[in-house]
Amino acid sequence: MKLFYKIFVFLLVSNICFSQSSSNEATKLRQEGKLEEAIKAYKKEYYKSPKDSKNTYNLACAYALTSQKDSAYHYLNSALKDNTSLWALVDSDLYELTDDPRWAKIESAQLKKFQELNGAIRQVEYAKKLLNIILKDQALDYYIDQAKNFYMKQGYVPQWYYPLGSYKQKIGHENYSNMEKLIREYGWPKYAMVGELAADAPLLVINHHKSDSIRKMYLPIIKQNCFDKEGSCMEYAKIQDRILVNADELQIYGMQFRYNAIRELEPFPIKDPEYVDQRRKEIGLEPLKEYLKRKINYDWTVIQKNKS
């Protein structure tokens, strides 16, 4: 149970989701763990609208989640034909594809298209390695999320969860070690060096590390980059709040959640909650009411004030 709890907490603090939207029927089936049925639903939509790149992308993801690599690559290449973003390179749904030689072609193609549109990335090889770290940081989340849903419905941990949880922790240890090596070689990543998406890699790994001593060690540089607009203030807020919550102190940005007595998510207690939006605004975050409704469907009703 201890292992499940650790991964369970990890899922609460991990807020990245890179899957794109598609048909409600297919998405519902996917969320329920019915991947083969989801594939059929995505393909049905594909035959009706073959140029719908979002649906085609999700079809590729569903194939990847079921380790059907050839089909996954077929639809992924189609979906990304006119796509100039880097999101596919960090989508954990595609993790199963990354040990295939074809993945390098996907990486190169997306990085080329992205730079043609947005300008050259100063350290593109560093960016590529950081993007891979982000993808691995989220690896297996779909399957572990299925275990979480099972636990919430049935009240006990499914036996198939434990090897996944153990492997997830192993990936986390390897990712942190690789991150340290990259920082020693290239320096701390900033937006100007590797782009906004890649620069978030160390923050995600640090936030998901089991040790608060690691988070505390890196917090000053994470905070400074936030204020210098060279790093994510969202991830800084998550890390700062996680340190406080783990020390049984009040969080200050409202980024950490817990399950209450009726197994519904709510934010951990917040210091001076009537001023939380003012603190969030100072680092460019949306009002807490909007954030909580969007992330956990929680109604935040504390009336906000401003200190002069």
Region roles according to the model:
Residues 58, 91-93:
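Canonical tetratricopeptide repeat
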Residues 45, 78-79:
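Canonical positions in the second alpha-helix
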Residues 20, 54, 88-89:
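Start-of-helix register in tetratricopeptide repeats
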